[in-house]
């Protein structure tokens, strides 16, 4: 069991290093792997509240706030007030965030190839 946990940890670490390097190579400096979880949620849903995002990525609202603040600062998303309820704020992708989807998918595809390259089709399922 210990060896399995060690292996999973090494795979996670190597995957994160790959993602960070690819983000940098594609001009997305400042982004980190944990930002990807939020982007995935927003690629699936056009607008979400902080609570919705927290539920989507299984993180606390304070953690989501820090991640969203950084993504907003980098220009990938913005906050919009609800037309129906001014107390409600939605998080939405900017054009930069929408355009980044192509790069995001490319990096994800490369990561999957790297992770599954030595596995048979049966093992990868």
Q: What are the language-model segments listed below?
A:
Residues 7, 60, 66-74:
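Long, contiguous secondary-structure blocks with strong helical propensity
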Residues 18-60:
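N-terminal helix-turn-helix DNA-binding core of bacterial DNA-binding proteins
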Residues 4, 34-35, 96, 123:
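N-terminal positioning helix adjacent to the helix-turn-helix/winged-helix DNA-binding module
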Residues 12, 31, 46, 57, ...:
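Flexible interhelical turns and helix-capping residues at alpha-helix boundaries
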Residues 69-125:
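Charged, amphipathic alpha-helical coiled-coil/dimerization segments
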Residues 50-51, 62, 69, 89:
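Residues within helix-turn-helix
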Residues 1-29:
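N-terminal leader segment of winged-helix/HTH proteins
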